[in-house]
Amino acid sequence: VDAWPWLRYAPVVMAAVAAGVPVRGGNLPRSRMRAAMQDAALDAHLPPAALALQREAIAEGHCGLLPPDRLMPMVRVQLARDASMARAVLDARQSGRTVLLVAGFGHVRRDLGVPTWLPAWFTSKTAIAQAGQAPSAIESEANYIHATPALAPQDYCAPLRGPGTATPVR
């Protein structure tokens, strides 16, 4: 399941291109993912409680189907992606200009994501476009939440579990 199809963020990227604003990628290159999976030093970046939240989010995001021995490597990839995006944000800084990071909710969380990799002197604000009334966004520390109409309920995990194994949507 492609969580970030181009159609979801194309309007933001294309508006920036049309306005002549530089657009840069910030994700961790695929070539560095295997090394990140094995980099246990990443485990120390977050406090233990936050690392536990990140583990839960990764497990849930993979529909509970990730084998236990693959969970921490996937958490490390998430942490490495956040670090890579933070470096891209810092590298894009220009005096008097704003840097906009377009990323998923897990990456913009102040307690788990990219902001944890930014230096203390760096001022950042978080805006979330939220479909419906998801408690995670409402309870987040975002500076701004832009509400959009709720999406139709869908079990995104059903295709991963296989035919006949769908669970009711909550």
Identify the role of each PLM range.
Residues 1-94:
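A substrate-binding/cap region within the structured catalytic cores of diverse enzymes
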Residues 73, 77, 96-107, 125-128:
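Glycine-rich anion-binding loop/nest that anchors nucleotide
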Residues 84-93, 107-170:
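C-terminal regions of proteins
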